[in-house]
Amino acid sequence: ESKLSGIGNTDFMQEVWYHKSFKLNNSWKDKKIFIHFGGVDYKCDVFVNKTKVGSNIGGQAPFSIDISKAVNFTKNNDLIVYVIDERCPGSMNPSPWYKGRFTPKKIAIAKKWALDKRRTQPRGKQSSFLHSYQCVYTRTTGIWQTVWLEAADKKHIKSVSIVPNLKSSCFEFTPDFSANVNDNFKVDITFKNKKISSSIFNTKVKKIKIKIPKPKLWSIEQPNLYDFVFTLISEKNNKTLDRVKSYAGMRSIEIKKNKVYLNNKPLYQRLVLDQGFYPDGIWTAPTDKALKNDIILSMKAGFNGARLHEKVFEDRFHYWADK
């Protein structure tokens, strides 16, 4: 539906298809190959070289699919994504305001669609009618966030949970690996490019605690962030199997007596209502800079946070909020 897509068709589209060809580098052989989708609205099936490799339901959450068994390295690979987006969930009883703007025929069409779906699919602020009205806007159908490929060793880091503990001045790490590995897990911590610590643990250790001397706290006024490099190292030959970069702030947040406390101090929240719609991209921000500027402009206007409204924002927005 968006202008940025190059199509700009705002009619109801219940089914859409995508096709793209890609070639893999030979250096990716013998590795696990994943395709990542930042967001696809709403139900989708993914095919690689005519083989169905996975499905997903949910328009705003990211997902990944292992496509290792379906790809080849001798010629182009064909990627096809089939999306079903059943618009207009729930019943619809148009008010006189709607009737004054839309023809009876358009209202009847929208009402029929709505009653058919019975609230089976959440829509957020997406319009049930052909056009925007009141505080609901043009629909988003299909792929609206970044899609990318990743090659990883068969033994790799799936995720690392990072929890700051202000009372003990430490970070608590809970790594998750792709297999039942018995190797080494290295954690390097820096602050503004200055080395804080470097530690190696066996992957059998479920929870890791690393103390931070004289921690610099994260706050809205001073968003101090510690940088981490997590490395999975083979026990057999000391080979690096996987490396992941991340970051976190040392801070505490809690609710006491109906007040929010940040770092043990009361925080009065002045929140801008952010609905995450863009004139040319609808749900999709036109650039990374646009995401960053939304945060900068709201802070210049005197706000210290945002109430993200009826949309799951992309990770990149939260990245800039942390910064």
What are these language model-derived features?
Residues I65-A70, K209-P223:
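Signal that preferentially marks extracellular ectodomain short beta-strand elements
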Residues D78-V81, Q222-S234:
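Short, aromatic- and glycine-rich surface loops/edge beta-strands on solvent-exposed regions
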Residues S2-L24, W28-H36, D41-N49, G54-I57, ...:
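Active-site-adjacent substrate/metal-binding segments within catalytic domains
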Residues A151-V181:
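Surface beta-strand/loop "capping" patches
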Residues I84-S91, I233-L241:
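Short acidic/polar inter-strand loop motif in beta-rich domains
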Residues V46-V48, S169-F201, K206-I208, F228:
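Beta-strand-rich binding/interaction modules
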Residues M92-N93, S198-S199, R243-A248:
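Edge beta-strands of extracellular beta-sandwich domains
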